[in-house]
């Protein structure tokens, strides 16, 4: 729910490096 929104916002910069972004994907 809302938690995913906040987590996604904090992971935004990491997704560029293919780090936690892969986990969310």
From Swiss-Prot:
Gene Ontology BP terms: starch biosynthetic process
Looking at the keywords, is Chloroplast present? yes
| An annotated Gene Ontology molecular function | alpha-1,4-glucan glucosyltransferase (NDP-glucose donor) activity
A single cellular component GO annotation: chloroplast
**Source species, domain of life:** Eukaryota
Q: Which residues bind ADP-alpha-D-glucose?
A: 16
Q: Which family does it belong to?
A: Belongs to the glycosyltransferase 1 family. Bacterial/plant glycogen synthase subfamily.
This chain's protein is named Granule-bound starch synthase 1, chloroplastic/amyloplastic
